Amino acid sequence: MKNKPDDRRDNVDKIQYNITKTIQNCELADEMIAKTDDEKTKKTLIEKNQRRREALDGMREEIKDEARDKKNGYM
């Protein structure tokens, strides 16, 4: 079986999609935090959003790297 060549042309788009969805999930969780009285649920959502924000930092760095590599022709 032949290996597929590494096709990174749409990586920037994929990462941007993931960033957008992660931000939407954070916003939805923030709404739930504001509406719920359940402290356990609030704590869980706050922790999850913290992990999402950390992931966003990583994705933003990754998208910069991919955009630079795309501009340079993926050499």
Curated annotation (Swiss-Prot):
Question: Mind telling me which Pfam families this protein's record contains?
Answer: Tlp
Q: Where is this region: Disordered?
A: 48-75
Which chain regions cross the lipid bilayer? Answer: none
Supply the InterPro entries for this chain: SASP_thioredoxin-like (IPR017524)
What NCBIfam families does this protein's entry cite?
SASP_tlp
State the family named in the UniProt similarity comment for this chain. Belongs to the Tlp family.
Annotated protein name in UniProt: Protein Tlp homolog
Q: What is the lineage of its organism?
A: Bacteria, Bacillati, Bacillota, Clostridia, Eubacteriales
